[in-house]
From Swiss-Prot:
Binding site for substrate: 188-191
Listed CDD domains: AdoMet_MTases
Molecular function per GO: nucleic acid binding; protein-(glutamine-N5) methyltransferase activity; protein-glutamine N-methyltransferase activity
BP GO terms, sorted: methylation; translational termination
Family named by the database record: Belongs to the protein N5-glutamine methyltransferase family. PrmC subfamily.
Record bears the keyword Isomerase: no
Annotated organism of origin: Aquifex aeolicus (strain VF5)
Protein name: Release factor glutamine methyltransferase
C-alpha cells in the first residue's frame, strides 16, 4: 500500500524563530501583511498554523529584505495615521514624524469650514489624503516632480475614496498652481544636505535622491516656500512644514523675514520637527 506523507504545518511562533533577531520586527510586519492582520496581532497568533503558500511567500520576501530592500517596498504598502498607503521604490516612505505634521495641520482646519490647501511634494499622498479624510469639506491641490509619486498619490486617493477632492499635478514646486491662492500650504520637502548623500544607509537611498536631498544646504526648499508662500496664501493663511531636527532656527528666521508668526513643535525624540507659520492679521 502506497504511503501518503502529509506536510507538517508550521506555526507563527515557529516561523518567527527561524528569523535572525535583527530582522524580527521586519518579519512580524511582513507576516502580518501576508496574513492580512495588524502587526500588533502577531503575538496573539503564535499558535496559528500557516498555509504552505504563505510560508513560501514569507521566506521569499524576507530574502528581499535581507538584500537591503526596505520593508515597505518589499510588501508594497505602509501605514500612516493608522491607514494603509501603497508605496514604491523611489518615493518617500511615510514616517511617524510626518503624523505630527498632519495632526498639527488638522488643528488649524475647522471641521465645518470649506478650505482649499496646497501640498508641495506629494510623495505617496499620505499628508493630503489624511487631511481630506479628516476634513470632509476640504479640497487639496498637490504637486510632485516625480511621475511615480504623482501616480501613486492618485492611486492612494482612489483607494481612500478622496480622489474627487484631490487634484495632483506633475511639475516643480508652485509652477503647476501659478496664480492660485490657498488657505494653507503644507509640505514635507527634501531637507537633507547633498553632502550627506554618500553616508546615508543604502536602503534609505532607495527612497530616491529627489525625495531626500534638499540642496547644498538642505534648506533650499524652505527658502522657496518662504518666498513663494506669500504669493500663494490667502489672507490669514498658514504654512505647515516638516523640518530636519537641526533646521528649526534657520527655517524660523526665513519665515519671520516674510512677516510670519512662527511656532516650532518637537517630535517624539524631543527634536524640532514641525513648523507652523501664520500670516499676521
Amino acid at each position: 500500500m502506497r504511503k501518503v506523507f502529509k506536510l507538517n504545518k508550521v506555526k507563527v511562533k515557529e516561523l518567527l524563530k527561524k528569523v535572525e533577531s535583527e530582522y524580527r520586527r521586519d518579519a512580524e510586519i511582513i507576516l502580518s501583511y501576508l496574513l492580512k492582520v495588524s502587526p500588533s496581532q502577531i503575538p496573539l497568533m503564535y499558535a496559528r498554523e500557516i498555509p504552505e503558500e504563505i510560508v513560501k511567500r514569507f521566506f521569499k520576501q524576507m530574502k528581499e529584505r535581507k538584500k537591503g530592500i526596505p520593508t515597505a517596498y518589499v510588501i508594497g504598502e505602509w501605514e500612516c495615521m493608522g491607514r494603509v498607503f501603497k508605496v514604491k521604490k523611489g518615493v518617500l516612505v511615510p514616517r511617524p514624524e510626518t503624523e505630527i505634521l498632519i495632526e498639527r495641520t488638522l488643528e488649524l482646519i475647522p471641521q465645518d469650514r470649506e478650505m482649499v490647501g496646497f501640498e508641495l511634494g506629494s510623495g505617496t499622498g499620505c499628508i493630503s489624503i489624511n487631511l481630506l479624510i479628516e476634513r470632509p469639506k476640504l479640497v487639496m491641490y498637490a504637486t510632485d516632480v516625480n511621475p511615480d509619486a504623482v501616480e501613486l498619490t492618485k492611486e492612494n486617493a482612489k483607494l481612500h475614496k478622496v480622489d474627487d477632492r484631490l487634484f495632483v499635478f506633475l511639475g516643480n514646486a508652485f509652477e503647476p498652481v501659478k496664480g492660485m491662492k490657498f488657505d494653507f500650504i503644507v509640505s514635507n520637502p527634501p531637507y537633507i544636505p547633498e553632502n550627506f548623500w554618500e553616508i546615508l544607509p543604502e536602503e534609505v537611498k532607495k527612497e530616491g535622491y529627489t525625495s531626500l536631498i534638499g540642496g547644498k544646504k538642505g534648506w533650499e526648499f524652505y527658502e522657496l516656500i518662504a518666498e513663494e508662500g506669500t504669493k500663494h496664501l490667502k489672507e490669514n493663511g498658514f504654512i505647515a512644514l516638516e523640518i530636519g531636527h537641526d533646521q528649526g532656527k534657520v527655517v524660523k528666521e526665513l519665515l519671520e523675514k516674510k512677516c510670519f508668526k512662527v511656532n516650532i513643535f518637537k517630535d517624539y525624540a524631543g527634536f524640532d520637527r514641525v513648523v507652523i507659520a501664520q500670516r499676521w492679521s
